[in-house]
Amino acid sequence: MRKLILKAAVLLSASAAFFLPEVPAQDAPKRDYPIQPVPFTAVHVNDAFWAPRMEINRRVSIPTAFEQCERTGRIENFVRAAMVLEHKDLQDKHAPGYPFDDTDPYKVIEGASYALSVHPDPVLDAYLDALIAKIAAAQEPDGYLYTTRTIDPEHPHEWSGTERWVNEEVLSHELYNLGHLYEAAVAHYQATGKRTLLDVALKSADLLVATFGPGRKTIYPGHQIVEMGLVKLYRVTGRTPYLALAQFMLDSRHGGRSYNQADLPVIEQTEGEGHAVRATYMYSGMADVAAMTGDKNYSKAIDAIWENVVGKKMYVTGGIGAVGAIEGFGPDYDLPNMSAYNETCASVGSAFWNQRLFLLHGDAKYVDILERTLYNGLISGVSLDGEKYFYPNPLESNGQHQRSPWFGVACCPGNITRFLPSLPGYVYAQQGDSLYVNLFLSNKATVTLEGGRKVAIEQETKYPWSGDIRLTVSPETAGRFTLKVRIPGWARGQAMPGDLYEFAETRASEPVSLQVDKHTVPLNLDHGYATVTREWKPGETVDLHLPMPVRRVTANAKVAADRGRVALQRGPIVFCAEWVDSPDQHVRNVVLPASRTLKADFAPSLLNGVEVIRGEADAYRYERNGKLAHTTEAFTAIPYYAWANRGAGQMEVWLPTTESGAHPTPFPTLASQSKVTVSGQTEAANGTRSPHMLADQEEPGSSADASSQYNWWPKKGSTEWAQYDFGGERRISSVDVYWFVERQGGVRLPAGWRVLYLDGAEWKPVEAGGPYGLALDQYNHVAFQPVKTQAVRLEITLQKDKSAGVSEWKVQ
């Protein structure tokens, strides 16, 4: 993309028009959120934590995401669709990889537009002009925009359906694509003043208004977000049919599946269920409609859902969506760590949702969750250099998790690129004559309060490493107004709202203190905010001190995976132990007794500068004779968001406090010391698949235990293999295979399998002494005539419409 935008700059005018012309509006919005965020363009971040990340996002993540969209044909799909509309001969009419591939350029355009708003860049501006022209050319005359159908109306992607919209409630993603288009269009218009993409969006939205609604087609989006996009178009234009359609689509949800929150009417839903990204986008859309219409049924429903999610289904990192097979919520308190999915997109969606709930209710608890997610489960989704991404964000790893530059389903990179540049818009908010301070980071901002009073505010802090924050408040003229400063729950002894997590230490910590012009004032807490109402003069200071001791966190006893374990937290940051910092490069064998003292110190040269927690822990291992041994060794924990930036290996957030909870390092076996390869070995679609999991000596709990396994998804009906190379000739006589299956996915038992050994350069079947078993929840043992060989293979025949997987494969 770096070369592409330079080429575009030559072809197009490099001058950027940073103005905001009026869009003709039918009606101005009459209602809105009672609290309004201060626009991100009014907040200039200059701290050492977020400013570098935002700059890396601008300089690295956005350009490389555009490069990936070019390389993988996502942008070419628009060119191909335009050729069809122009009646040109298109030889290649193959369907895109997925029908939602159109959204990836849209999301990166949105992020690039936010970046342009605060950092004018004529080269990037010109590149967007060229890209938007391609998108506009792919739009059909009536406004329909969906490249896979336009490229080949007779044979679109298999998920798309034979006609427009007929498969929308299941898999086509037609409306999902448009939701991201609308959000990108509004962002681009507001950043540049140009209507090029906005006109495409409005033409599309007018088609939706003409197609769906009372007396027309009834439909609910299979993957929610168009509701949020329609509300954004309503905000810009004031055209009430867009808002009405967003509400109609929400109200049409019932009689479907819980997977996409369509089993019950939205106002009757009370629990987080199904696909987590779909869910948070829907809850955000419900909040928007509630704010714009005043319908309290929506807010009542999402309030109940929030209590369920935060109280029973959220990880200590703020991540949501425990179940990988559905990328979504599991049962209450079912929060496994190694198989935790916690999709990066779900964390972004959670941030959207919690921000909207704060704007509705003005309670700091929503910002507490936003902050927890932001500093832990969200930014863990991108590497420190801005070039690689996590799709899932587990809380435990045996080395199978690695960030990837891109994915087949590439929703997460685009979501990161659009969220980070908008972060300054989450710092402050305003209601009447009250100014809310929600997030702590060094910045300068100007806020307009009720009556047009302008207040300049400056923050100076080393947060999140220090809890000392100085605010300098400078109204244009002296006057009376209210400053509301969030006091985080973690600083008030509350690990998280509700009883899902709590601090292990019951002793009182150092109190929070607040000073105005160096005079201590009472906190006067109101819904989690220290409230100071007074006559303010320019240049007055507010000093907030939030103590940051190292805290041990415990989980509700109903969370089976975390019993007898603690997580470590300091300030808003959750920590983890990572293999690199362990003397033996293992951390899952570590026990951290409650009696051990822990201290924090700043390591400026580590991971771009981080606070680390140090102490001593006990490390357990099995010796050759099978006896359990342990040693006391130095212990180091790093911020969770920074893990997997130094290579693949073990990681653990929840640390056992006694020997019974440890995973002692096993004594090596023939399989564990072998080189492991598999057929069709490529990077997993979500960056979590590694062949070495077949021989990691991790005993599965059941065949459905997804924590440590390898599968061949999305291969179906083919013959696949896994291979151990011994590095020399070995005598073997049996294998044990533990099959992995998904309860709700496409990985099932194979149709059959056999064992082959390498004889010279030829693979030969062994002479098995019994059947090749396909039993679940146990090892399938096959003994055979002993052979001497340098390598052995499992050859697996997949069922016609299914894939297969293996949790563990032993060789004797």
Regions found by a protein language model. Name each.
Residues 8-18:
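Bacterial N-terminal signal peptides
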Residues 28-122, 126, 156-191, 224-241, ...:
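Aromatic (Trp/Tyr) and acidic
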Residues 124-147, 297-310:
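Carboxylate/His-rich catalytic cores and anion/metal-binding grooves
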Residues 151-172, 198, 203-219:
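Asp-box/WD-like beta-propeller blade repeats and closely related beta-sheet repeat scaffolds
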Residues 220, 665-667, 702-812:
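Aromatic, loop-rich ligand-recognition surfaces of beta-strand-rich domains
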Residues 302, 368-376, 381-472, 492-516, ...:
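C-terminal beta-rich recognition modules with glycine/proline-rich loops and embedded aromatic residues
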Residues 664-702:
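Predominantly extracellular/luminal regions of secreted and cell-surface proteins
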